[in-house]
UniProtKB/Swiss-Prot annotation:
This is Subtilisin-like protease 9. Residues 128-395 form the Peptidase S8 domain. PANTHER family: CEREVISIN-RELATED (PTHR43806:SF11), PEPTIDASE S8 (PTHR43806). GO terms for biological process: proteolysis. It holds the Pfam family Inhibitor_I9. The keyword Secreted applies. Keywords: Glycoprotein, Hydrolase, Protease, Secreted, Serine protease, Signal, Virulence, Zymogen.
Amino acid sequence: MGFFRTLFSFSIFALSLADTSKFIGLDDVDNIIPNSYIVVMKGAVTEAEFKDHQVWASRIHRRSKRDGAADGLDGLKTTFDFQGFKAYCGTFDKESIERITRSSDVDYVEADRVVKMAALNTQRNAPSWGLGRISHKKAGSFDYVYDSDAGSGITIYGVDTGIDIHHPDFGGRATWGVNTVDSENSDQNGHGTHTAGTFAGATYGVAKKARIIAVKVLNAEGTGSTSGVIQGIEWSTNHASSNGLSGKAAMNLSLGVRSSSVFNSAAEAAQRSGIFLAVAAGNDGFSPASARGVCTVAATDAQDQATSWSNYGSTVALYAPGDKILSIYPNGGTATLSGTSMASPHVCGVGAYLMALEGIGPGRVCDRIKQLALESVKNPGPDTTRRLLYNGSGA
């Protein structure tokens, strides 16, 4: 399958550990973060048991540190606890992680891994066509037809490289949320601003009145970690819950990771909390595109052709414009990018648009989008839908 050009490429890898059948091992090892792990608890583990387990794991690490086996390792660093998903990440020596994995409280362990951004194809200031396509039954129009509600009352979390929240196209609707990757609270890459401009910008966006929150999980080079992305998802879920936004929120994830149970679990927990998730399609069972309940998006060009670099398969919910998409860029600029990453925010924006227009809950959004979609995609891959995103404008 062709690799999409702007999807973030994650590689999840595992060490070979003796007698640890609950350790999820994968066959690629190039991007593993040495000695860094994500430990996922069983669903029946209570809050008290989770805290007791953390104390126990920390004690194991301190013992290894005294013995000189864990020099330079921090032990338990970050915990996750939202919507039934309990986990923690940390750096441990081999013997300690083997003991932790054998705990009766632990469901499985995955190696933490580097997140890398694939190369972007950029055509500066090219004409855009995506908004016209998603609001017309026939290809070729550049007019965007939409209801004036335009996502009003809906909040969209952009989990990405950050967002230039001061870009004039947002008109003050964008705010900074959290940064899990570095100390620079800005988009130094551009990808996150571009995707946000597509899902909610005033000029280039679908849901032009939605509120936007920047969740930075990748740095200027487009790199981060699985645990950092999960921190961003958890923060968004908790923020929505504590601010009365559950049921009125969406999340765009223009990123993915090679077949990851922990990533899928985090995405599913966010969806259960009352957030609609639009996710860029990946390659060979990428997560969270393979998670239950998320709306997985592949890419088409202006002629409704499935692009050669977009993923295909049964996990794809529908296609959306992803080739040569014009949107905003940091410092007041614009750029034209291509990729599945550009298709996903079109669907995220339509999801927010329909939530505002029809009052539907996040759990019903993807089905409603598929119901409205056009059977227009040409040459999709084997076992792949022909559905193309349409906002139901009637045009």
